[in-house]
C-alpha cells in the first residue's frame, strides 16, 4: 500500500514538474500583463518616481470616464467597426466565392489564382502599408497612369487639328481650335490668347511634331494629383480597400481546404438528381462549412481590432485623425506627448471587451441558425 502511495505521489510530482513551467510562462506572458493593465487603468500612474511621475495610487474609474467622453474614442471605434464590417461582409464572402470558383474549376489554372490571391498574406504588413502609401500618393503609379492617359488623349486631338489643317499651321482657325481644346484654364494663361499662342507655336517651328505635341500637352493638360490618403472625407476608403485586398486570400485558403473535405460523391449525386450550382452551394457546401464560416468570422473580428501596423504605415492615423483606430488611439495616449498610461490601459481593456462581445454575438448567431463548429 505504501508502495502504491509512493508511486502515486511520484506521478503527481512528475505531473506538476511538467505542468508548472508552462503554467509559470502563461502567468508571466498572459495573466500578469492583464492584471497589471487592470491595475494601471484604475491608477494615477504617470511613470513613477524613476521618470519624475507622481506616487502610484488608486484613482478609480476616471480613465474609463475620460475615454467614453472623448470624441476621438468614438471616432476610432467607428473606424474599427468599419474594418469589422469590411472583414466579415467583404473578406469572407469574397474568400468563399473565390474558393468555390477554384474548387469547382470554373476558372482556368486554379493553382495559379490560389497562389496569386494568397500572396498578400506572406508580405510584411509594414511593407504592404508603405507600398500602398506610394501607390495612392499624388505622384504614385495611379496618378502617372491617369495623367499619361489625359496627355495621350490631348495629343491625339492636337494631331487631329493639325492633320485637318494639312500639317503644322499658325492659322487663326488652328489657333482657336487649340485654345478651345485647352479650355478656360488654358486660355487664362494668356492676356491676348490668339496672337500669344501663335507666337508660342512659331517658336516651336522646325521641331519634330511629336515634341510640339508633348510641349503643348505639358502646357495645357493639368496634372491630376490624387489625394486619397490626405482628404479627410475619403481617406478611410483606401485603407478599407487594402484590408480587403490583403486578407481575402487567407479565407480563400480556409474555405477551399474545407470544401475539399466534402465527399465529391454527394455533390455528384445531387447534380445527377438535377441540382444546379446554387442549390449545391446552398444545401451542401454552406451547411458543411458553417463551422468554418463562424470560426473565420471570429478570426476576422479579432483581426479587425489589431490593424495597427498596416494603418500606421499607410496614414499614421491621419489626416486629422480620420483613419485613427483604437490601437493607434491607445498608442498615441501611451507614447506621444505626455504619456497617459491609465488612459492607454483603459483603452486596451475596452478593446478586449469589444472583441469578446463581438465574438459572443457571432457564436450566438451560429447557435441561432444551427451551425456546428468544426
Q: Residue ranges of each PLM-predicted region?
A:
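A structural signal for multi-pass alpha-helical bundles of membrane permease subunits
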Residues: 7-374
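N-terminal leader/signal peptides at the extreme start of proteins
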Residues: 1-7
Amino acid at each position: 500500500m505504501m508502495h502504491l502511495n509512493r508511486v502515486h505521489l511520484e506521478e503527481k510530482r512528475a505531473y506538476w514538474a511538467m505542468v508548472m513551467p508552462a503554467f509559470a510562462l502563461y502567468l508571466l506572458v498572459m495573466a500578469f500583463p492583464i492584471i497589471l493593465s487592470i491595475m494601471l487603468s484604475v491608477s494615477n500612474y504617470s511613470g513613477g518616481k524613476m521618470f519624475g511621475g507622481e506616487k502610484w495610487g488608486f484613482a478609480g474609474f476616471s480613465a474609463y470616464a475620460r475615454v467614453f467622453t472623448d470624441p476621438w474614442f468614438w471616432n476610432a471605434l467607428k473606424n474599427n467597426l468599419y474594418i469589422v464590417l469590411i472583414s466579415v461582409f467583404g473578406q469572407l464572402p469574397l474568400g468563399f466565392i473565390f474558393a468555390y470558383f477554384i474548387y469547382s474549376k470554373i476558372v482556368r489554372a486554379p493553382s495559379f489564382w490560389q497562389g496569386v490571391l494568397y500572396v498578400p498574406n506572406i508580405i510584411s504588413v509594414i511593407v504592404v502599408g508603405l507600398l500602398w502609401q506610394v501607390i495612392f500618393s499624388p505622384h504614385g503609379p495611379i496618378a502617372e497612369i491617369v495623367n499619361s492617359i489625359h496627355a495621350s488623349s490631348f495629343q491625339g486631338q492636337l494631331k487631329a487639328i493639325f492633320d485637318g489643317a494639312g500639317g503644322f499651321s499658325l492659322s487663326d482657325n488652328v489657333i482657336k481650335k487649340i485654345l478651345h481644346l485647352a479650355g478656360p484654364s488654358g486660355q487664362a494663361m494668356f492676356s491676348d490668347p490668339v496672337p500669344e499662342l501663335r507666337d508660342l507655336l512659331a517658336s516651336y517651328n522646325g521641331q519634330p511634331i511629336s515634341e510640339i505635341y508633348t510641349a503643348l500637352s505639358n502646357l495645357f493638360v493639368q496634372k491630376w494629383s490624387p489625394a486619397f490618403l490626405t482628404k479627410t472625407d475619403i481617406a478611410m476608403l483606401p485603407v478599407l480597400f487594402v484590408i480587403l485586398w490583403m486578407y481575402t486570400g487567407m479565407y480563400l485558403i480556409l474555405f477551399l481546404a474545407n470544401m475539399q473535405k466534402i465527399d465529391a460523391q454527394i455533390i455528384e449525386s445531387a447534380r445527377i438528381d438535377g441540382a444546379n450550382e446554387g442549390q449545391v452551394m446552398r444545401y451542401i457546401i454552406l451547411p458543411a462549412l458553417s463551422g468554418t464560416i463562424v470560426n473565420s468570422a471570429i478570426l476576422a473580428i479579432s483581426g479587425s481590432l489589431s490593424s495597427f501596423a498596416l494603418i500606421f504605415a499607410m496614414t499614421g492615423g491621419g489626416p486629422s485623425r480620420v483613419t485613427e483606430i483604437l490601437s493607434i488611439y491607445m498608442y498615441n495616449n501611451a507614447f506621444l506627448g505626455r504619456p497617459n498610461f491609465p488612459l492607454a490601459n483603459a483603452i486596451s481593456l475596452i478593446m478586449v471587451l469589444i472583441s469578446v462581445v463581438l465574438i459572443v454575438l457571432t457564436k450566438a448567431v451560429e447557435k441561432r441558425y444551427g451551425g456546428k463548429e468544426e
